[in-house]
Structure formats: C-alpha cells, structure tokens
UniProtKB/Swiss-Prot annotation:
Catalytic activity field: phosphoenolpyruvate + UDP-N-acetyl-alpha-D-glucosamine = UDP-N-acetyl-3-O-(1-carboxyvinyl)-alpha-D-glucosamine + phosphate
Modified residues (2-(S-cysteinyl)pyruvic acid O-phosphothioketal): C116
Gene coding for it: murA
Name of the molecule in the record: UDP-N-acetylglucosamine 1-carboxyvinyltransferase
CDD domains named among the record's database cross-references: UdpNAET
Cited InterPro entries: Enolpyruvate_Tfrase_dom, Enolpyruvate_Tfrase_sf, MurA_subfamily, RNA3'P_cycl/enolpyr_Trfase_a/b, UDP_GlcNAc_COvinyl_MurA
Binding site for UDP-N-acetyl-alpha-D-glucosamine: R92, D306, I328
Length: 419
C-alpha cells in the first residue's frame, strides 16, 4: 500500500495547472448512459474514482476510450442495467447510474454505495424522487431495484434536504421523462450547472440549474455530445491553502474564481494577498502574518464542506484561535486526531472544531481517513518540522491528480513509496 513521505519546513512557490473537477466529471460521465450515441468529454482528470467509473460503464456495456485527457463514451452499446457491488462499493457516486438506467431502459439494479466514510449520506432522497416519477423501487439484499412501465412521468419533487447527488440523479432521470419535472430545494453547486450544460448539449430541455428550482421538460431521446469538464474548485482551493500555510506564493492556472468566491473571501480574511483573473488565481503570503478564520460549512453558495479539512489545517498554523463548524456531514472531523498527533491544538465540541495557537508542529506517521482529510494531513506535513508519513493515500488518489508531482513542482519535499 502506497504512502507519502514528506520532509517538512519547505516554502512553496510557482505555478500549478488545475485539473478537471472530479465532482463534475463523475455525474457527467454517467450521463453518457442516457445518450444513444458517442459523447466526447475533455479535461477529464485521471483519478481513482474516474477509473472506477470507467470500469462500471464498461460493465454496463458502454464503449469507453481514452485519448489524452479526453474520454469518449458510446452509450449505444449499453445492454446491462446491473451496477454490481464490487464496483459500487468503491465509490458512492456509483449510485448516479440509477437515474439514467431507469430513465432510458426502464429498470436498474444498483448496489447500495460505498466511498468515503464521512457520514450516512442515505439514498432515500434519490429513491423518493424516482418514486414520485412513477418508478417502483425496493431495496433488498444490498441492492436498489427500480422498474417503471414505459417512461418515467414528470413530477413536482420537493427534496427534504439539499442533496447534490439526489439533484444530479433526478435531473438526469427527468431528461427522458414524459412531461415536466420540477426539482424544488435543489442543490446549486457549480457542478450541477456543468451537468445541466452537458445534458442540454445532448438535447435536454433544462432551465434553472444553479438555483434551488430546476425545471426539466422531458424529451424522447438524447444524443451524444461534446463537453469540457469545468476546473476543480476544490483542488484550486487546496493549492491556495497550501501556499498560504507555507508562507509562499502560487498561481493556479486553468481555473475559475467564480465557483470559489466563499473560499477566496476567507483566504483574504487570513491576510493573504489574492489576485483573481478570468482563468487564474494568484495568492501571495510571503512576509505576511497568517491569521486564523472562523468557518461554517453550508450548501453552495456557502463555504464548501470539501474545503473544511484544509482550513482546519490552516487554522492550526495560523495566529489566533478560530472555530470550524461542519453543518453538512455529521462525521467529518476524522482528520483532527491525526493533526493532534502532530501537535495541533484542536478540541472538538459537537460539530465544531476549536483551533487554538499551536506552538510547534512535528512530523509524525498519520493515517488518511477520507479524501479531503488526506489533503489536510499532506499540507500540515509540508509545514511541520521533520518527517511526516501519510498512510492510506488511496483516499487522496480518488480526488487529486498527481498531487505529489504538483506539490513537488512548487518546492515541497514529498515522495510516494510503497510501504
């Protein structure tokens, strides 16, 4: 099993090219199941979750071919509707096959999902929405079994809580439904808008994506399309935080500041100098005092939960004390005990982490527990004194493309090795 070995105490400076967004790519690749032709997706990141998605699409019968950072998927060859446990257990996003399969083929058998262990994240909202559209669903033996006679029917669906995954699943399903579907209390994340733009390119009729009310007028068929995956706002934020923690500078290229405004606002509050342009963001923390900032996660356009762990790490090395409150997931502070092993002054009170002044951070052997937690441990290892070893880095490979190469290019002393 691979691990990262980090020699701490280095500064960071340079440029980094941001990859395509994992959280946009996954639903968009599954959207290819809706089309009866070839779809070409560019700016696709080479990640563990993308490899899992590729394997799942092939299992369903799709033709999948890589050409550089381009993925060509032919949905015309799909001839199976069973998403098996051995693949779905690796990634929660696999449940996004449910909506497209039942919408196009009238049936689906999808294993209950796996992925990061950061909360229950039940699929009830997905199931309830599809039932409102006429699907008959039962869950038994670890599988969601869905059937519909004929086409799904358009419906008005109010989601009891904001759910990115449920919004994506129901949005995809509604594109082939008979009639109009309205999704109320929908998620507003940029990745939802990117998915909608892709579906529109396939021939879907969608308005309101990016707001909490999305309207979809169903069509009888969708064709293949060409679509470029939007830049990864979380990867961008991670590298900006890394430079701020290390007292350095970084230019993030091929990114979009519009999707990252809550993070940029908080970075400015840390006393970082930031310059934003149409497709790049520059941060400079050289010679400046890093200040702790209070964070409260919220659905978009609030502060993203996927940046919570990185800002926890930032507050550990910043001057002053601050609180980090997590409102999205109930179990997303598993990085805190690992940071404490490195000397971090943090205590937990319910869903809030209280970060105080930390005198010294020392390298230690720590364990990644989920994707973003692993990023926080890597960033802390870069600024800690001595050697840090991060185990179970398969988590980071799920969502960051060549993170060690990109950090090394900025000056970090980080190497991958087999333990």
């Amino acid at each position: 099993m691979d691990q990262f070995v980090i020699q701490g105490g280095t500064s960071l400076a340079g440029e980094v090219t941001i990859s395509g967004a994992k959280n946009a790519a996954l639903p968009i690749l599954f959207a290819a199941l809706l089309a009866d032709g070839k779809s070409t997706f560019t700016n696709v990141p080479r990640l563990r979750d993308i490899v899992t998605t590729e394997a799942l699409l092939k299992t369903l019968g799709a033709s999948v071919n890589w050409q550089g950072d381009t993925l060509v998927i032919d949905g015309a060859t799909v001839d199976k509707t069973l998403a098996p446990y051995d693949l779905v257990k690796q990634m929660r996003a696999s449940v996004l096959t449910l909506g497209p399969l039942v919408a196009r083929f009238g049936e689906a058998q999808v294993s209950l999902p796996g992925g990061c262990a950061i909360g229950a994240r039940p699929v009830d909202i997905h199931i309830q929405g599809l039932e409102r559209m006429g699907a008959q669903i039962n869950v038994e033996n670890g599988y969601i079994n869905a059937k519909v006679n004929g086409r799904l029917k358009g419906a008005e669906i109010f989601m009891e809580m904001v759910s990115v995954g449920a919004t994506e699943n129901l949005l995809m399903a509604a594109t082939l439904a008979d009639g109009k579907t309205v999704l109320e209390n929908a998620a507003c994340e940029p990745e939802i808008t990117d998915l909608a733009n892709c579906l529109i390119a396939m021939g879907a009729k969608i308005t309101g994506a990016g707001t909490n009310r999305i309207e979809i007028e169903g069509v009888e068929r969708l064709a293949g399309c060409e679509h470029r995956i939007l830049p990864d706002r979380i990867e961008t934020g991670t590298f900006l935080v890394a430079a701020a923690m290390a007292g350095g500078e970084v230019l993030c290229k091929m990114t979009d500041f519009h999707s990252l405004e809550p993070v940029i606002e908080k970075l400015r509050a840390t006393n970082a100098l930031l310059e934003v342009h149409d497709n790049s963001i520059y941060l400079d923390m050289r010679g400046r005092e890093l200040k702790a900032v209070n964070i409260k996660t919220a659905p978009h356009p609030g502060f993203p939960t996927d940046m919570q762990a990185q800002f926890t790490a930032l507050n550990v090395v910043a001057n002053g004390s601050a609180t980090i409150t997590e409102t999205i997931f109930e179990n997303r502070f598993m990085h805190v005990p690992e940071l404490q092993r490195m000397g971090a002054n943090i205590r937990l009170e319910g869903n809030t982490a209280i970060c105080g002044d930390t005198k010294t951070l020392s390298g230690a052997q720590v364990m990644a527990t989920d994707l973003r937690a692993s990023a926080s441990l890597i960033l802390t290892g870069i600024v800690a004194q001595g050697e840090t070893i991060v185990d179970r880095i398969y988590h980071v490979d799920r969502g960051y493309e060549r993170i060690e190469d990109k950090l090394s290019a900025l000056g970090a002393n980080i190497k991958r090795r087999s333990s």
